[in-house]
């Protein structure tokens, strides 16, 4: 599957805020955004007037970059969200939250979504007892995500278990069993991403 291979820190600078794409590094002074919080490029430090379209586009780009999704796949998620009963923007975020790589990140098995994505593609997880290595796999309510038996001896997973993450209320975990479960769909209030999904809907509605 195609993916972004450029400098990750440039994405945060482009959006004008930390997107926490590098996990723990983003909380240190080594974070590039701390040193240069303006947009990348020769004229990045110069403030420009942004049109309504530009604001909407930036919001969509921000959401894509937070979840690590390319344009075509993001549009597919939007089209699915349109056909689900409810508010399209909220439906979009819920679909993104229910991706396997995001669930793994939310459970604490990865300091960033990018790291969680790598762990999934390397085959470290089971969903309902079956190995799944597809990051975009849609996890459903009552699905159980488990770390593979052979992966549990890894220092990386031991560290995650020794330092459990605070979970959103729609997830629960059995740390000793290296297991997590989706107990409900996330509500909009549960999704702590700095995105105004209404602007994304306005962009795609044109």
From Swiss-Prot:
What Gene Ontology molecular function terms does this protein carry? rRNA binding; structural constituent of ribosome
The cross-references to InterPro entries, in alphabetical order and at most eight, read: Ribosomal_uS4, Ribosomal_uS4_bac-type, Ribosomal_uS4_CS, Ribosomal_uS4_N, S4_RNA-bd, S4_RNA-bd_sf
Entry's family note = Belongs to the universal ribosomal protein uS4 family.
Species of origin reads Clostridium beijerinckii (strain ATCC 51743 / NCIMB 8052) (Clostridium acetobutylicum)
Sum up the protein's function in the record's words: One of the primary rRNA binding proteins, it binds directly to 16S rRNA where it nucleates assembly of the body of the 30S subunit.
| SUPFAM superfamilies associated with the record | Alpha-L RNA-binding motif
Q: What is the protein name given in its UniProt record? A: Small ribosomal subunit protein uS4
Q: List the disulfide bonds.
A: none
Q: Domain S4 RNA-binding, which positions? A: 98-163
State the Gene Ontology BP annotations: ribosomal small subunit biogenesis; translation
- GO cellular component labels: small ribosomal subunit
Q: How does it assemble?
A: Part of the 30S ribosomal subunit. Contacts protein S5. The interaction surface between S4 and S5 is involved in control of translational fidelity.
- Family matches, as NCBIfam families: PRK05327.1 (NF003717), rpsD_bact (TIGR01017)
